[in-house]
Each structure stands twice: as structure tokens, then as C-alpha cells.
Amino acid sequence: AAPKLMMSSTPQWKDKSLWFYKVNEDYGSFAPLPEAQKKVDELIKGKKTEMEKIAVLTHWVADNIRYSGISMGKGEGFTLHNTQMNYTDRCGVCKDIAGTLISFLRMAGFEAYPAMTMAGSRVESIPADHFNHCVAVVKLSNGTYMPLDPTWVPFCRELWSSAEQQQNYLPGVPEGSDLCITPVSAPENHYMRIKADNRLDANGTLRGTFTLTAERQSDSNKRRIINTRFHRSEEHT
């Protein structure tokens, strides 16, 4: 254990939220791009509900914008790179992946904004700069904001990783926001069931299949294991 000292000249979280919103809008981080608009139109074609559209856009970004931590030098920080750079390079860190999703959502007609969070740690009540991760929020038809994290959901079915429960985040929205927190998800929402169907042949050989059924974090963990091992086996082939 060690003491932790937090200091800030920002009076309240709403002030930081408004600043984060303004710095990215002024820079033009989410300006539309014709080539990207074509991709968005292609992805949402035939999708009827807002959740269908949000899901297909989130998963395309998660699966196609590769995580690559390359420093761009002076000027890095809370300003998200613009749509043209992200869509052209198809790689970047969390803020680039989140920024691409925000741009895609806006081109699909949604209100979407960036949000700051601290992956794996608690955010204290003092409105200081203690964030290490960038995510997105989208405004639903009922007026509420839904957090999305494309960095943590490649090749899985979730839109916000279940590993990020009770995680604080601060949206950069035009009306300003207080510090938010993701809800707890009950253990029964993350089940894994294994069904074995085996038969013993006359010659003593055991043959059969195992069927795995899983949801949320259990499902994501298994998909990650399978995907990682598949790529490793390809590298050694």
C-alpha cells in the first residue's frame, strides 16, 4: 500500500466533460469522410433497429481497426485523430479506434461522443487527469447514453466488455456530464455450459463431441482463446 495524492484545478467533472467535448469538436476529430460514408451505408443497409445499426458499426470498427501504439510525437493526448487519418491507416490506439466508431455512428445519424475512462482502476472523486483509456458513448432514442468500447470487443459479441464492470467514465458531451459508472452484471449472465455426447465403440475407442454454450464474458474469453491459438498455429505452420 502507498499514499495517493490527487490534485486538480478543475472545479467539477462537468467542466472537464465540456472541455473534452470542445477540444475534439474544435479540432474536427469526427468530420465525415466520403469513403467512410460509403462503408457506413453498406454496413447499416437492411438494419431496422438502432441496436442493430450500433452493433454492426461497433463490431466492424473493433475487427478492422488494428491496435497499434505508435507515438505521433508532440500533440498527442486528449485530442482524437480525425476520421481521414484513422480510416486511411486502419490502425491506432484506443482513442483512434473509439474515434473511428464515433465518426461511423455520426455518419449513420446517431449522436456519439468520446469518453475517458481508467481501465482496471478506480477513478477518484477529484476531477483530475487520471485516465488511461478512451471509449465512446452513443445517444439512444430514449435519450440515455450507452457506452461502447470497440478496443475491447474484437471478435466477440459484446459491445462493452463485461470485464469493465463498475468502471468510471466521463463522456465529453455538449451538455456536460458528471462522472458515470458502468453497472454490475450478475454472474448468471456470464455462464458457460458444456454438453458432452460420447460413445464407446466396440473396439474400445471413445468418440464424441463437446458443445460449449456461453454468454458475455465467458463467451468472450473462449473466443479470445480460440482466436489467439488459431493465429499462433498459422504462424508455426
Regions found by a protein language model. Give the residues of each.
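Secretory-pathway-linked proteins and extracytosolic
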Residues: 1-75, 202, 209-211, 215-230
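Alpha-helix capping and helix-loop boundary segments enriched in small/acidic/polar residues
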Residues: 31, 48, 73, 85-92, ...
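Short, solvent-exposed loop/turn segments at the edges of secondary structure
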Residues: 35, 129-133, 191
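Short, conserved phosphate-binding/catalytic loop or strand-edge motifs used
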Residues: 37-38, 73-82, 118-120
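Active-site-proximal cofactor/substrate-binding loop regions of enzyme domains
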Residues: 54-56, 62, 68, 81-92, ...
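Hydrophobic/aromatic-rich core segments of domains that either
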Residues: 95-185
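Long, His/Glu/Asp-enriched segments that create or flank divalent metal/ion-associated functional microenvironments
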Residues: 179, 183, 188-197
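Conserved small/polar residues in nucleotide/adenosyl-binding loops
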Residues: 235-237
